[in-house]
């Protein structure tokens, strides 16, 4: 493939920056992160002004309200981004971590963590990802090429300019943080094939974006999957807990990947549980799309279509199904789940352990909301995404997931015989 000359320049600059950044000390990186945090606050009005342009354009295009809400920034949102950078400062630096051992022949081997190199982030219209990704990549010693959704281009331009300038002012390599300002899709297609310049691509967004990157990229991809997350309310559940957990997992922030999309209810408790949950959902404006049994119990529920079971609603919509027991629930999750986050509400230890061990997902819960699948809530600090694949990284990806292993071997005239 022929690459745009400008894209090659960006790739080469990132490669050169990654080489230098790999050896940057923790103190120097932390100093840069603090400068980035301060710069966001100092440029708040410019950032809000740019974001306003993006929001107005999105509204004029008829963009869904939930997506506009993701796009919009506020003064509080900028302060939160600044605080997130300071939190990354307080996280341990994974670069250089490792272990050391000596073989019987005297050969000394050190396994140590090193940066991946150049990370390309392809993501949708969420300006906070621009800052989070840049911070995590810098702390872990990686250069980053950012390609956000075109709807957030003005926001991303000012954010990347502000934080990159602050990092460089503290001695970080020039071009360690770069934004693809050209929103032409051909550039994205080329970026995904820039082996030799880019070491890994991390897509973050909806199913369409992730599927496109996984299908078309020749550069290695860490797949941050979509979240068709389920809650199974067991026949031995505490129903009050069930209502609380399911309601929180659906409504606390419905437009994110760890929000609940379907509830499966054991038939033994469906007649009692569904009206309790249904009334709370109805009062909050949540649309319920149910199976025949659900609709018989809740006359105001809409009849679910086949496509409702395997979709990320990302809105105040939930699918509901009555099941015979944990086996049918796990079969349903196996068929429609995306291996992201699944939860069971039960007081039965044996059933809980079966669910934990047999459900294949990055995070599996007992009596807790799926909304906890998050780097910060897991104690990793900020996250660059939630991986649903099994190779290299799985679940919330913090700093350590942006490193790999290197072996340093010390000998004294050791030869193989």
UniProtKB/Swiss-Prot annotation:
Root EC class: oxidoreductase
Q: Which InterPro entries match?
A: Ald_DH/histidinol_DH, Ald_DH_C, Ald_DH_N, Aldehyde_DH_dom, G-glutamylP_reductase_CS, Glu-5-SA_DH, GPR_dom
Q: Could you tell me where this protein is found in the cell?
A: Cytoplasm
List the catalytic activities from the record.
L-glutamate 5-semialdehyde + phosphate + NADP(+) = L-glutamyl 5-phosphate + NADPH + H(+)
Q: In which pathway does it act?
A: Amino-acid biosynthesis; L-proline biosynthesis; L-glutamate 5-semialdehyde from L-glutamate: step 2/2
Q: Which residues form the signal peptide?
A: none
Highest taxon above the source species: Bacteria
One GO location term (cellular component): cytoplasm
Q: Name one GO biological process term.
A: L-proline biosynthetic process
- Which keywords label this protein? Amino-acid biosynthesis, Cytoplasm, NADP, Oxidoreductase, Proline biosynthesis
Sorted alphabetically, which Pfam families does this protein's record hold?
Answer: Aldedh (PF00171)
State a single Gene Ontology molecular function: glutamate-5-semialdehyde dehydrogenase activity
The record ties this protein, via SUPFAM superfamilies, to: ALDH-like (SSF53720)
State which Enzyme Commission number(s) the record gives: 1.2.1.41
Q: What task does this protein carry out?
A: Catalyzes the NADPH-dependent reduction of L-glutamate 5-phosphate into L-glutamate 5-semialdehyde and phosphate. The product spontaneously undergoes cyclization to form 1-pyrroline-5-carboxylate.
Family (UniProt): Belongs to the gamma-glutamyl phosphate reductase family.
Q: Which HAMAP family match?
A: ProA
Q: What is this protein called?
A: Gamma-glutamyl phosphate reductase
Q: Which organism is it from?
A: Desulfitobacterium hafniense (strain DSM 10664 / DCB-2)
């Amino acid at each position: 493939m022929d690459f745009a000359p400008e894209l090659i320049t960006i790739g080469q600059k990132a490669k050169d920056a990654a080489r230098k950044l790999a050896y940057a000390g923790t103190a120097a990186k932390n100093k840069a992160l603090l400068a980035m945090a301060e710069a966001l606050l100092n440029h708040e009005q410019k950032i809000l002004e740019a974001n306003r342009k993006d929001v107005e354009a999105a509204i004029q295009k008829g963009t869904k309200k939930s997506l506009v809400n993701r796009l919009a920034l506020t003064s509080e949102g900028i302060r939160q981004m600044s605080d997130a950078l300071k939190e990354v400062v307080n996280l341990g630096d994974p670069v250089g971590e490792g272990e050391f051992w000596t073989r019987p022949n005297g050969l000394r081997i050190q396994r140590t963590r090193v940066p991946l190199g150049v990370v390309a982030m392809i993501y949708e219209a969420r300006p906070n990802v621009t800052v989070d990704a840049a911070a995590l990549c810098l702390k872990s010693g990686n250069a980053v090429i950012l390609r956000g959704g075109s709807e957030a281009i003005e926001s991303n331009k000012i954010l990347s300019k502000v934080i990159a300038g602050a990092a460089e002012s503290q001695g970080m390599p020039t071009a360690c943080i770069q934004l693809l300002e050209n929103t032409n899709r051909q550039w994205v297609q080329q970026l995904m094939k820039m082996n030799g310049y880019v070491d890994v691509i991390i897509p973050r967004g909806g199913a369409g974006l992730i599927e496109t990157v996984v299908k078309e990229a020749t550069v290695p991809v860490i797949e941050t999957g979509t979240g068709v997350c389920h809650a199974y309310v067991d026949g031995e559940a505490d129903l009050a807990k069930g209502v609380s957990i399911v309601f929180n997992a659906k409504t606390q922030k419905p437009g994110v990947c760890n929000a609940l999309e379907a509830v499966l209810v054991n038939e033994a408790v469906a007649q009692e549980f569904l009206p309790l949950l249904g009334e709370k959902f109805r009062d909050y404006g949540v649309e319920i799309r149910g199976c025949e049994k659900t609709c018989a119990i809740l006359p105001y529920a809409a009849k679910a279509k086949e496509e409702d079971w395997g979709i990320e609603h990302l809105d105040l919509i939930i699918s509901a199904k009555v099941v015979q027991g944990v086996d049918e629930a796990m079969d349903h999750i196996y068929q429609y789940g995306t291996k992201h986050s699944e939860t069971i509400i039960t007081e039965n230890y044996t059933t809980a352990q079966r669910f934990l061990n047999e459900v294949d997902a990055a995070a599996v819960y007992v009596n807790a909301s799926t909304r906890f699948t998050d780097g910060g809530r897991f104690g990793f600090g900020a996250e660059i995404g939630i991986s649903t694949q099994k190779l290299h990284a799985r679940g919330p990806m913090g700093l350590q997931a942006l490193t790999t292993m290197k072996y340093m071997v010390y000998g004294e005239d050791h030869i193989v015989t």
